[in-house]
Amino acid sequence: MKHRGLGSSLLSALVAGAALLSVQTAFAQNDDRPPPLNTASAVKPPATPAAQVGKLTLDNQVKWLRAAQQSGTLEKLSDAQLVALFQSLDPLALPRYFKEGPNGYPSYEFTMSRSERIRGVWPEQPDHMLVRVAHNPLRIYAKWLPDGAHAGQEIIYDESKRSDQTYGHLGGIMNVMPLWTSLTGALARSQSNHSVRDLGTEYVVQQYLSEGRKYTEAGLPRSTQIEVKTIDGVRVVAFTFETPVGQPEFYAKKETLGLDLRHPFFRSIESYDNDGRLFEQIVFENITPKTFDDSTFDPKNKDYQF
């Protein structure tokens, strides 16, 4: 995620005096850093109507997005309102919104569907995975579910123990042979173009921001198409970005990223190569904050098959 600031002039510098005073008052309760995603927050809906947000300063557009996300205002907007809103924003507003985050939880569990083109071959069936992630230190448990490719596989990564290796088994009859493997070794690359460390919502946001910096540094325009989609029952705002240069300078020639309406992260990623072929498709399904103990990342856990 897959999945990117944008380089362009601001749509407006300052709004008129009286309007600016009212906007600043409306956002006074939202001037602090965003709270963690799993922290209860009673943020008031922003006072400025969605149709007028494009007239605000860049800073206040970002604050409006944050307040609208946390208060539930974004998800209440119609499809047409969402498209018009994001079309009206300063090109730097969305990157700033993501940069301020938070782009994930301190620890959380999610299920995901993932397909990647490996050595030119698109898989017949996507991976369906259950993933548990904790930070500081980064620890990951992943299991490939029965209804997807590579069913039965399990891996554990703990950067506090072996930062360059994972412990896992291939599933099926091979699950009696767990072994340590390199994060970037042949076995890991046979199933994914990514490291296990890339699992999670945070990586996709950082990829998006990194790609955006490339556009700015190269002085290239970043064309954007905006639409609203429902993916696996989740309504998202889908942004399609296409670069005139393509790979290898950029991660993808074209990408479509689906923005979650309640959190500053992406729920879906589609990436296309220079020939227009889809080479990566990821959907984060259920994302749930959870607190884990050490047994979650211990291969001796009785619920695991190591």
Model-derived regions: residue spans:
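Gly/Pro-enriched, hydrophobic low-complexity segments
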Residues: D31-N38, P45, A50, L145-D147, ...
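An internal, short helix-loop-strand segment that often contains or flanks glycine-aspartate motifs
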Residues: I173-Q191
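Sec/Tat signal peptide C-region and signal peptidase I cleavage site
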Residues: Q24-A28
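N-terminal cleavable signal peptides for secretion/export
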Residues: Q29-H128, Y304-F306
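Bacterial N-terminal signal peptides that target proteins for export
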Residues: K2-A13
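A short, polar/proline- and glycine-enriched secondary-structure boundary/capping micro-motif
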Residues: V121, H150-D158, V176-T181, E249-Y251, ...
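N-terminal mature ectodomain segment of secretory-pathway/periplasmic proteins
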Residues: L89-N175
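Bacterial N-terminal signal peptides
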Residues: S12-S22
